[in-house]
A protein has these predicted regions:
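Bacterial N-terminal signal peptides
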Residues: 11-24
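Active-site substrate-binding loop specific to GH73 endo-beta-N-acetylglucosaminidase modules
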Residues: 146-149, 153-164, 169, 175-179, ...
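Bacterial N-terminal signal peptides that target proteins for export
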Residues: 2-14
């Protein structure tokens, strides 16, 4: 890009950002004279909310079925395989592997990892660079050239790293690529929208320890339960190795806990006639608490054990009740006690070990015994059962019904959820025992959702914007990693949001002159074929191959239409290059109207 082009794009972004930042929706009165009729406006609105952006095929399908029947079809469980999507995902070999296989194939041994981190720290210090962020996170945010230089420098210093350096990055990179491909090309779009919603709600950071190897299994857990009962989803998350490790509950114990208690439990392991020990179901073994086959005779590692409140706090504040849900610090402490001993087979409170079983286990000797008092309810001493009772208490609490309903209404209707709809959704949640599918039906069949009041009221996140641009333009994607890198550059690295809050679902998080410039740059690069492995055939050309205009391009890829102000601004910019077809596509994709859904 020349300096002149860069300056022109910056000026254009400044001219457009005020329109994107206007409060409230871009209602029908602001649209161009070519705006769609009311039935089509409803169709476009529904597709903007229940998919990652309308495609021409989606529009035809909804027009054929009708909006109500199409919504019902999206809410029904899928019955057929998406073979086209499976073909696209096939080259991403790590997506079909579980945590055990991933760790066996890709995990860098701790001593090698320490050498890498030390070398990077020394390099950054000598170059006077800030050390913000985890090393893996900084690596993910590098451009491809910087990554290549990083690898070459490490291998020159440590030749033995040649076959190891960067292997965990492959796992996360393929997770990101798979997420982009599913969102862009899956037939069942609402499944993908809900998978994204629940991962953000139950966020984990893939760069914390071995979590990167657990995320695939974790996301499958969320997908399988994304339309079911909320309590089932909550229990599955609580017992998932990814969440247990991310929020440190895997090492939460009774302060008086001693690993020796688990060595005694080893005696319960039956020794068969062939002399090979076989674990009895649910029997605890030394590896979980930091021991292992090679050090059982050694003294347990010296470590200060105790209760960790991280999961208990986020369980109530972020996963169920909400920050104003009626709990106090004493409840956090009691819940934390109840979840002591909820750990990971192969990790355990003694520290991560090379045993890679990576599945939930309950370590009874590490559990704080005695009754607990949570939200005014006495939870009787019962080991693992205490945690399950608390999850039931929270899943069925009125504050949870309202908090989850409010987040769903925010996702599908407006940043400031209409109270009446939240009330009705929460009532459905309570009546059905937390049936997510029925809560969604209440929201998606409501006047607030289907009516004109909240159309175009949501601003797309970087992930939604990039994927919707691919879908609207009909781009062919051979290299989804380049799209994931662009999403990361816009401030939303997939699976790499470190705080448990996830990414904010609100316009103010994503609107600025800088962000709109980044989006415009992406749109123009996409339409011009400057993204490696992503291409547009006949960009801007209509079926009859007539010379395109801004209006004809907008009608094809932005059916809701441009506002008169945007049309005027973009028309002036397009004429600078003689209405170049590719540039017309890029300008429409970068318009304020395309940033909204």
């Amino acid at each position: 890009m020349t300096r002149r082009e860069s300056r022109s794009r910056a000026i254009l972004s400044i001219a457009l950002v005020s329109q994107l930042a206007l409060p409230g929706p871009l209602g029908a009165t602001t649209l161009a004279p070519s705006q769609p009729p009311d039935d089509d406006a409803t169709t476009i609105h529904v597709l903007n909310r229940l998919t990652f952006g309308p495609s021409s095929a989606d529009l035809e399908k909804v027009r054929r079925l009708g909006v109500s029947e199409w919504i019902d079809a999206q809410l029904r469980p899928g019955t057929s395989a998406d073979t086209a999507l499976a073909t696209r995902l096939a080259p991403l070999v790590t997506l079909s592997m579980g945590a055990v296989e991933l760790r066996e194939k890709y995990e860098i041994p701790p001593n090698i990892r320490q050498q890498i981190q030390k070398a990077r720290a020394e390099r950054d210090a000598s170059a006077g660079k800030e050390g913000a962020g985890a090393p893996g996170e900084r690596y993910e945010q590098m451009d491809p050239k910087a990554r290549r230089e990083e690898r070459e420098a490490m291998v020159r210093r440590f030749p033995q790293l040649a076959t190891l350096l960067g292997t965990p990055q492959k796992v996360v990179a393929e997770l990101q690529a798979g997420k982009v491909l599913r969102a862009a090309f899956a037939e069942r779009q609402l499944d993908e929208v809900m998978a994204d919603f629940w991962f953000n709600h139950f966020n984990v950071f893939a760069r914390k320890g071995p979590v990167e190897f657990m995320v695939g299994d974790y996301e499958r857990t969320l997908r399988e339960r994304s339309f079911g009962k909320f309590e089932d989803l909550l229990v599955a998350v609580a017992q998932s190795p990814a969440m247990l490790f991310y929020l440190d509950n895997w090492q939460s114990t009774d302060p008086n806990f001693s690993p020796r208690d688990l060595y005694r439990a080893q005696a319960r392991t039956r020794m068969p006639a062939n002399g090979s020990p076989r674990r009895r179901p649910n029997a605890m073994v030394p590896e979980m608490m930091g021991g292992g086959a090679n050090n059982q005779a050694k003294q347990p590692p010296k470590r200060t054990f105790g209760i960790n409140e991280n999961y208990a706090r986020e369980l109530m504040e972020l996963h169920t009740l909400g920050v104003d849900g009626g709990y106090v610090q004493a409840d956090v402490v009691e819940v934390a006690k109840a979840f002591t001993g909820w750990t990971i087979l192969g990790e355990g409170p003694g520290g991560p070990r090379r045993n890679k079983e990576s599945r939930f286990a309950f370590a009874a000797p590490a559990h704080v015994k005695g009754d607990k008092r949570v939200l005014g309810v006495t939870i009787k001493d019962g080991g693992e059962k205490e945690g399950l009772e608390i999850l039931h208490l929270l899943a069925t609490h009125p504050s949870t019904a309202r908090f989850i309903s409010s987040k769903l209404v925010r996702r599908f209707v407006a940043d400031h959820p209409p109270e009446g709809l939240v009330d009705r959704a929460a009532a459905t949640f309570a009546k059905t025992g937390g049936d997510i599918r029925e809560v969604l039906r209440t929201i998606l069949k409501s006047e607030e959702f289907l009516g004109p009041a909240y159309r175009a009221a949501k601003v797309k996140t970087p992930f939604e914007f990039v994927v919707s641009a691919v879908r609207a333009s009909g781009a062919e994607v051979r290299n989804p990693q380049v799209l994931a890198q662009k999403i990361s550059a816009m401030g939303m690295p997939l699976y790499l949001q470190q705080p448990p809050t996830g990414y904010k679902d609100a316009a103010e998080e994503w609107i600025s002159t800088t962000s709109l410039l980044e989006r415009m740059n992406f749109a123009l690069d996409l339409s011009a074929g400057r993204l490696r492995g992503v291409s547009l055939k006949g960009a801007g050309r209509s079926a009859d191959n007539k010379a395109p205009t801004l209006d004809t391009v907008a009608a094809r890829i932005l059916p809701a239409g441009l506002s008169p102000k945007s049309r005027e601004t973009l028309e002036a910019e397009a004429q600078k290059d003689g209405n170049d077809p590719a540039k017309l596509v890029g300008l429409v994709l970068g318009s304020p109207e395309f940033q909204r859904r």
